[in-house]
Regions:
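Low-complexity, Gly/Ser/Thr/Pro-rich intrinsically disordered linker/tail segments
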Residues: 362, 367-408
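C-terminal soluble interaction/assembly domains
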Residues: 317-337
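Flexible, low-complexity junctional segments that flank or bridge functional domains
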Residues: 21-248, 252-254, 334-339, 390, ...
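C-terminal motif of bacterial Sec signal peptides marking the signal peptidase cleavage site
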Residues: 16-19
Length: 408
């Protein structure tokens, strides 16, 4: 797939220059830097973010001011015999609260916990904190609620074919809704599942084949619904399965730029982010509707945006989560993205963040903001619990009654 080839080229270019930076890498590598105190931990985490964060040229956070304010506070903590984990958590939460990378997660284990601390590890998610302040915020709805709504449609004979499975890899629901090929994924795991033969992968493949046959091979097709509500993201190569079958020429979504190098503003050039058509494809002359909500993040947002670029595509639902930066990180090569030990064994920190910035075709970077729908339909918990999915119903109505919205 073209985006993947671009990423590989970018990495090769950076590798060629690593040999002249080995000494700096040893000094500044936050994957191996030792420490014993809260101040030393703060220095490693602050510098790791300072060197590896991808959004400094558009992020409003004054990171130098953060250092000036918090270094004395961490010095004070380091002089104490023990440190309450709650205090440490409050410091890191405030430090990172204004960072716009909505993939970001900062995991910290207290190096000097108090004896009565029952919890010594915490996670800071700036994106989650921001999203929860939005007036339309709601929790992710369960598959069981969605299945109740689908069963209600089945009772009226609108749904005649369905396949569903919930596996450790994620869940998938495919069905025929009155001639509409419908697909719901909890995450993008098709690249993995369709290339393996274990029982979970086979169940996912069976459900996907139902959707594919309906969308690509069915004689009568009224529309396609790609439901990404609550989808947390996943493999970017899943474009090969959810969008490439419906295009006959390359589709450019925008450009990506990688953070590479120790300086804050060391970036790669902007490179086109393009989806290639599948070898077997069908360009439908019917509406393709992307369903997405506030809990749609990362790859699900890019898929939703890609649908809006199609002449017969639209987005129904809510403004999305706002985590658009791809993650293909190797900090020791690019000096960007995720660093630390996920298991908190080699280091007492783990910082997960994007190392690329995605810029849509219109040039408006929406990291931390999310994509807006062509047709807004807010989640209605009361109706959903009663088996009435107002967002899905709106998508069906657009397709069956020719109510295609214009771009916002």
């Amino acid at each position: 797939m073209k985006p993947l080839h671009i990423i590989i080229v970018s990495i090769v270019v950076v590798v060629a220059g690593v040999s002249c930076r080995n000494h700096a890498n040893e000094l500044l590598n936050p994957n191996t830097a030792p420490y014993n105190t809260p101040l030393e931990q703060f220095e490693v985490v602050w510098n790791g973010i300072n060197n590896g964060y991808a959004f400094w040229d558009i992020d409003p956070t004054d990171w130098d001011s953060v250092y000036t304010v918090y270094k004395p506070r961490f010095e004070e903590l380091s002089n104490q015999t023990s440190v309450p984990t709650a205090t440490l958590q409050n410091y890191y939460a405030d430090m990172c609260s204004r960072l716009i990378d909505h993939h970001m997660a900062v995991v910290i284990r207290n190096p000097k916990p108090a004896a009565d601390d029952t919890i010594t590890t915490f996670v800071i998610n700036p994106g989650n904190s921001e999203v929860r302040t939005r007036p339309y915020y709601h929790e992710r709805f369960s598959d069981s609620l969605l299945l109740v709504c689908i069963d209600k449609l089945r009772s009226t004979a609108l749904v005649d074919t369905m396949a569903y499975c919930n596996t450790p890899q994620g869940s998938i629901l495919a069905c025929n809704i009155n001639g509409i090929a419908y697909l719901h994924l909890s995450k993008f795991m098709l690249t993995e599942a369709l290339n393996n033969n274990d029982s979970s992968s086979q169940a996912i493949a069976k459900a996907y084949r139902l959707f594919y046959d309906l969308a690509v091979h069915a004689d009568t097709l009224k529309g396609i619904i790609l439901d990404q509500r609550g989808n947390v993201g996943g493999y970017v190569n899943d474009f090969d399965y959810v969008l490439a079958p419906f295009i006959d020429k390359p589709l450019t979504l925008g450009t990506t730029r990688r953070k590479e190098g120790l300086a804050r503003y060391d970036y790669s050039v902007w490179i086109p982010f393009t989806i290639e058509p599948a070898a077997e494809h069908r360009v439908p002359d019917v509406p393709i509707v992307a369903l997405a909500d506030i809990n749609s993040a990362s790859m699900s947002e890019l898929t939703t945006y890609a649908v809006t670029l199609l002449p017969n595509g639209c987005f129904v639902g809510e403004r999305t989560y706002g985590a658009h930066g791809p993650l293909f990180s190797n900090f020791e090569i690019n000096y960007s993205g995720t660093f630390g030990d996920k298991n908190l064994q080699k280091t007492l920190h783990y910082v997960y963040m994007s190392n690329d910035v995605f810029k849509p075709n219109d040039g408006n970077i929406l990291e931390g903001k999310g994509f807006r729908p062509n047709h807004q339909v807010l989640f209605n918990s009361e109706k959903m619990n009663a088996g009435d999915d107002v967002q899905l119903n709106a998508a069906i109505d657009i397709i069956l009654n020719n109510k295609f919205p214009t771009n916002p």
